[in-house]
Amino acid sequence: MAIDQIPLRDAAVSLGPEQHGYPVTTPDRPIEVAAWVHTRLGHRQVTGEAVAWTPRAARIRYLDEHGRQGFAWVWASAVQRR
């Protein structure tokens, strides 16, 4: 069964390549995290997985309150391992 994606209007704001930087590390298995994201409704903490990272940021996969999947690059300081 496919997981619905979060519509762009409801998705978290994501950092761009110039902000998150390089090199990008992609683990064999994602790491469980809690992270702060910013959406049009404000800031909120989500649980999810870090699927990639750089020295400055992490790309997280998370589910919103409706069970829809989203991805966002966020600053490393906004992420904690669970």
Residue locations for each model-derived region?
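Basic/aromatic-rich interaction segments and small domains that mediate binding to polyanionic partners
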Residues: A2-A76
